[in-house]
Each structure stands twice: as C-alpha cells, then as structure tokens.
C-alpha cells in the first residue's frame, strides 16, 4: 500500500480532441492580441470585437463586403506585369517575384477591377490588395484602374477605388511613376460626364497612390485607424529631426484637418457607399425627382 502512493506520475499526453483542433479556429488581433473564434472574426468583417482594430483584407474580400451578391463581373484579370527594365537586384529576380506572389495570392497583380452594384445601383470598382508586393503601383495596376475609370465614363456610372498601397513599384521605375498621371487624366474624363469618383483609403495608403488619384476624388472616405500619407512617419522624423504627434498620418488626423470627408467603420461601409450612390443618381423623371427629394427629408 505504501508503494502505491509513491508511484511515479503517468506521463501527460494530449488528448485526441486537442490534437485534432485545426490551426484556423482562432484569430489573434494584431493590435491588442485578443483571441476570437475565426468564424466570429470573419462574420465581424475581420474587425476586433475588443479594440475595433480593422485588420487588412484583400481586394476580393472587399468586393464581397460591398457588392450585391453575384453582381461583380471582373475585367482585365489576364493582365500581367513584365520585367520591362530588366531589373537587377542582389536579393530577388522581379519576374520570379511576380510569379511567386501571383501563386501565393491567386491574382496577377495588386488591383482587382470590374463592374458591380450596391443595392441595385451600378458602379465600377478597382480594389487594391496590399498582400501583393505591398500594394505597389506598377504598369498593370495603373492600367486596370484607368480602364475601370474609362468604363465608368462610357457607362455613365460612378467609380469606387479602394486604395491600399506602399507607393510606386521600384522594379518598374518611370513606368510605375507615369501611372499616377495616367489615372488622373482618366479621371478628368469621368468628371466631364459628371460622374463621381469615390475614394476609400484603407491601411496603409502611401506614396504615389495617395499623392495622385486616391486624393483626386469627389468623396474621400477612410477606415478607422488607417495610416495615410506620402512618406512614412520614420522618414519624416529623420528628415525634420522632430517627433510627430502620436496620431499623425491616421484617418482621424486627416479628418480633423479637413483632408478627407468621413471616417467610416467597415460594418457601415456598404450602407454609406450605397447612400452616396443614391445621392449621385440622376432622376429620370419629375416623379422620380419628387420621390428623391421627399426621401431626403424623411
């Protein structure tokens, strides 16, 4: 009996149930570290239920969040970048990097573009995926956005751009920089047919994108906490040798200084853009006009 109580403890082994828990059950907030069931996290559009941090989502996910079901028709999906400069780097080969990134993300470049609708209201959309080479703007990026704007002008509908970028793609040099002008020129044609450009700035939006077409819009929206600017915070502080305010280059800072029109939570984005599209709809008759005016006063 004495030896019975002195037995060595049995080695601990994890249960069969614990071994079968898949990796994607939990999602961890990148801001506060809160753990949330992945399904609950996805249902909340990847916004943390504790701190309301908006995690980055892909261009495809943005379209699923905003567009009516089965309304999105993609254009120019076959456009692919090429190494037009023969870019040489000791770290990577541009063509190989493009191929590897395409395989990982399932897209040929940063932008996914096409036609869609919100609440039955048609528009053109060009959405950026930051996961593709940091959302960098190259020839394919600019061409797809410009074509989306031109389709909007041809159809007489608004265009929505969702902008997340680190700036121009260094691998394409001047060909990347010229996309800033190309898209901005396309937007002048949209303005001539009196259709709006709605720009949504999401984290992060920097460089040539924020310095060109993303800021040339009739309505500029941003997500809470999105980092927006031209040069990064560290670069500016090193240049001016001063510390910047804690909220510098955030969406809230831009709103406070009149540089954007609204900061909109992701859960309200579809409804907000739907209201803007209705606002810009042209009444087709006097009866429609009266209905529009009455609805506006309700």
UniProtKB/Swiss-Prot annotation:
GO terms for molecular function: acetyl-CoA carboxylase activity; ATP binding; carboxyl- or carbamoyltransferase activity; zinc ion binding. It catalyses: N(6)-carboxybiotinyl-L-lysyl-[protein] + acetyl-CoA = N(6)-biotinyl-L-lysyl-[protein] + malonyl-CoA. Residues 25-295 form the CoA carboxyltransferase N-terminal domain. A zinc finger (C4-type) spans 29-51. GO terms for cellular component: acetyl-CoA carboxylase complex. It is an enzyme of class 2 (transferase). Binds 1 zinc ion per subunit. Zn(2+) binds at residues 29, 32, 48, 51. Its main location: cytoplasm. Component of the acetyl coenzyme A carboxylase (ACC) complex. Biotin carboxylase (BC) catalyzes the carboxylation of biotin on its carrier protein (BCCP) and then the CO(2) group is transferred by the transcarboxylase to acetyl-CoA to form malonyl-CoA. Acetyl-CoA carboxylase is a heterohexamer composed of biotin carboxyl carrier protein (AccB), biotin carboxylase (AccC) and two subunits each of ACCase subunit alpha (AccA) and ACCase subunit beta (AccD). NCBIfam families: accD. This is Acetyl-coenzyme A carboxylase carboxyl transferase subunit beta. The gene is accD.
